[in-house]
């Protein structure tokens, strides 16, 4: 269920965020009616609240609270498939898990190092990410997905290796916060492709062999600590298709 269009964040690689402005939000009333109709006519029991960054909706807390109350005691679950690291909080986590069904949570730091995140204008700190995943883990989630990009402008090997270090820190923080070793995260890597109408539209792409080299380095770095590496899933696209 699309709850709004547009984005004001201005990530330099994101075409959708540039060409779908201005932000246009659906009201809580409209969303509630569309959810009711969708559940009635589709037969599905999971409601995904979609947008470029669903937690940025100005009424997302009240929206999730209202839907959670409306479908309390049923098998209907709520999810936010696309969530900004700095917009997710404990209140939102509690609303999403009210019925006891915790669907997937995906966060997109995009870059492994703070330097590369500044380059792409993704102003998310490591502290923000750790605090966010700890909030998820302590509210009952046992797995989160982290999305990154490889081949970004000015990227070096070290920027990619920082993805592995960040994933290790996520697992360590989750285990420390919950006292459980049943904590997992999936690292998903997509290749950077310049898009028209973005600040990076004329940026060159790295050669496929460079991308593949960095993906191999990342896999080795994730598995360099076997205790942590076993808790981290790793998904990526080869350099050539990108």
Region locations from a protein language model:
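Conserved SAM/AdoMet-binding glycine-rich loop
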Residues: 36-186
């Amino acid at each position: 269920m699309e709850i709004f269009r547009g984005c004001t964040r201005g990530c330099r690689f994101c075409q959708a965020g540039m060409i779908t402005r201005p932000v246009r939000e659906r009201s809580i009333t409209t969303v509630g009616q569309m959810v009711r109709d969708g559940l009635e006519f589709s037969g599905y029991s999971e409601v995904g609240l979609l947008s470029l960054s669903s937690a940025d909706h100005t009424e997302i807390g009240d929206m999730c609270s209202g839907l959670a109350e409306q479908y309390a005691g049923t098998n209907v679950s709520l999810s936010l498939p696309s969530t900004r690291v700095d917009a997710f909080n404990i209140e939102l986590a509690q609303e999403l898990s009210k019925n006891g069904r915790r669907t997937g949570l995906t966060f997109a730091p995009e870059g492994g190092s703070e330097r590369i995140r500044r380059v792409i204008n993704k102003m998310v700190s490591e502290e923000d990410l750790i605090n966010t995943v700890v909030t998820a883990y302590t509210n009952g989630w046992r797995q989160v997905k982290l999305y990154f990009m490889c081949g970004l402008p000015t990227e070096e090997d070290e920027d990619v290796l920082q993805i592995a270090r960040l994933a290790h820190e996520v697992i360590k923080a989750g285990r420390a916060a919950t006292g459980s070793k049943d904590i997992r995260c999936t690292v998903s890597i997509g290749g950077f492709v310049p898009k028209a109408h973005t600040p990076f539209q004329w940026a060159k792409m790295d050669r496929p062999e460079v991308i593949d080299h960095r993906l191999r380095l990342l896999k080795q770095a994730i598995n360099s600590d076997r205790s942590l590496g076993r808790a981290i899933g790793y998904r990526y696209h080869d350099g050539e298709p990108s």
